[in-house]
């Protein structure tokens, strides 16, 4: 069986949605026994579509033959635009958001804001340590002139402010 791609599952979902819409329309226009066979047919089609979707989304470990083939081929089976279903990893938090009928974009926005706050904290710490490094180097140069060369070497290695050694 060929590997299942995201577009295959997407098509299966669209088909299920289409069948549900058709059933909704048939139920809305139900006229009795004369439309019953059509409704039964549409329900059977929905059942088949759901069965296909279920089959396509079952996790299937790759067989040894497929693993050997993947090792031999340098090209991936799925393209960047249509990845294999088994390669898609969703964070459990996003799944929880969807299960709770919340918008996953809210999770993404909150996550980005959290990362930005963390980056700002780290930037502040980096600047504080750089300032401390420069103050410490200046004080060490003035207090221990014999260590001036080592201080300059450490400053150069850590990206600190360089001071002329000829004074």
UniProtKB/Swiss-Prot annotation:
One of its GO terms (cellular component) is mediator complex. Keywords: Activator, Nucleus, Transcription, Transcription regulation. InterPro entries: Mediator_Med10. It comes from the Eukaryota. The keyword Transcription applies. It is found in: Nucleus. One of its GO terms (biological process) is regulation of transcription by RNA polymerase II. Residues 53-88 are annotated as: Disordered. One of its GO terms (molecular function) is transcription coregulator activity. Pfam families: Med10. Component of the Mediator complex, a coactivator involved in the regulated transcription of nearly all RNA polymerase II-dependent genes. Mediator functions as a bridge to convey information from gene-specific regulatory proteins to the basal RNA polymerase II transcription machinery. Mediator is recruited to promoters by direct interactions with regulatory proteins and serves as a scaffold for the assembly of a functional preinitiation complex with RNA polymerase II and the general transcription factors. Belongs to the Mediator complex subunit 10 family. Component of the Mediator complex. This is Mediator of RNA polymerase II transcription subunit 10. It comes from Neosartorya fischeri (strain ATCC 1020 / DSM 3700 / CBS 544.65 / FGSC A1164 / JCM 1740 / NRRL 181 / WB 181). The gene is nut2.
């Amino acid at each position: 069986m060929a590997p299942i791609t995201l577009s295959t599952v997407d098509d299966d979902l669209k088909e299920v949605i289409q069948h549900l819409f058709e059933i909704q329309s048939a139920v809305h226009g139900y006229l009795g026994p004369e439309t019953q066979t059509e409704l039964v047919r549409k329900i059977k089609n929905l059942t088949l579509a759901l069965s296909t979707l279920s089959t396509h989304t079952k996790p299937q470990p790759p067989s040894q033959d497929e693993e050997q083939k993947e090792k031999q081929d340098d090209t991936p089976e799925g393209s960047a635009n249509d990845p294999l279903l088994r390669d898609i990893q969703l964070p459990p938090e996003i799944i929880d958001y969807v299960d709770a009928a919340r918008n996953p974009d809210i999770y993404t926005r909150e996550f980005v804001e959290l990362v930005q706050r963390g980056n700002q904290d780290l930037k502040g710490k980096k600047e504080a340590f750089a300032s401390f490094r420069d103050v410490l180097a200046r004080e060490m140069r003035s207090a221990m002139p014999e260590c001036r060369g080592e201080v300059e070497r450490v400053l150069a290695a850590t990206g600190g402010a360089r001071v002329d050694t000829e004074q």
